[in-house]
Regions:
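Mid-domain alpha/beta scaffold segments of enzyme catalytic cores
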Residues: 1-263
Length: 263
């Protein structure tokens, strides 16, 4: 069986309440041997770390504040995130960045919150788990101010254009891909992105419970979960005309090296 790492799961989402053990066991049964829980607020990051503590070597976590939650950011948030990031099972700073699509937090507040997390990444020497939506220009202007000091970065759930992908690759960033790559109605443009991006600069993720792959059998429950990660690898293999095992091996190695995860 191929083995995988899911670099982004929202296991604290209420859709997964009281099902953590079942979700994790189904993932393991499908070759998803390690998973990284996404922290999107101070509270959510703490919850993710607590869950990860119960599954050493299998679950890890990020710690950060999503741009939607930037409005809750204050000085206390910085010290709380710093303390979380000192823990070994917390492997990345984020999910952080800018989201100008819905503007759930005021843009100046998003920018300040993002800058603080860029600085935290430099301080604790842990990579960045980045979010950018409808904010490409401003996101890059801010990121470029820190570019030569930040350790490493992955743009999570990438759905941008080929030109945007090239710009991120030129910065040395990695790209995270979800089930969106199998959605030919909304994201057909990602086919050329997948063909272009080198396999050793890709990581795969479910972003569960969101981004359900379109290339899997139709189910009553339309909720995504980490057990479905192989369908993302399957789409990449199809578009690149390579084996699924090659996709699994390369993306797993990339994720382990990037996040410093041992198996």
């Amino acid at each position: 069986m191929n083995t995988y790492i899911d670099i982004g799961i929202n296991l604290t989402n209420k859709q997964f309440n009281h099902e953590h053990e079942e979700i994790i066991n189904r993932a393991l049964d499908n070759g998803v041997e390690q998973m990284i829980l996404t922290g999107t607020s101070v509270r959510g990051s703490k919850e993710s770390v607590e869950i990860a503590e119960d599954y050493p070597g299998i679950l890890f976590s990020t710690a950060g504040i999503h741009p939607h939650d930037a409005k809750s950011f204050n000085n206390e948030s910085i010290s709380e995130l710093r303390n979380l990031l000192k823990q070994d099972r917390v492997v990345s700073v984020g999910e952080c960045g800018l989201d100008f699509d819905r503007d759930f937090s005021p843009r100046p507040v998003q920018e300040k919150c993002y800058r603080v997390q860029l600085e935290l990444s430099i301080e604790v020497s842990k990579p960045l788990f980045l979010h950018e939506r409808a904010a490409f220009k401003r996101f890059n202007e801010i990121t470029d101010e820190y570019l030569y000091r930040i350790p490493k970065a992955v743009v999570h759930c990438f759905t941008g254009t080929l030109e945007e992908a090239k710009i991120y690759l030129d910065k040395g960033f990695y790209l995270g891909f979800t089930g969106a790559i199998s959605d030919q109605n909304r994201f057909k443009h990602l086919e050329e992105v997948i063909r272009y991006v080198p396999l050793d600069r890709m990581m795969i993720e479910t972003d569960a419970p969101f981004m359900l792959p379109k290339n899997m059998p139709r189910m009553q429950n339309r909720r995504n979960e980490p057990a479905f990660l192989p369908y993302v690898a399957q789409t990449i293999a199809h578009l690149k005309k390579i084996s699924i095992s090659e996709v699994a091996g390369e993306t797993t190695e990339a994720a382990r090296n990037f996040f410093g995860i041992e198996f």
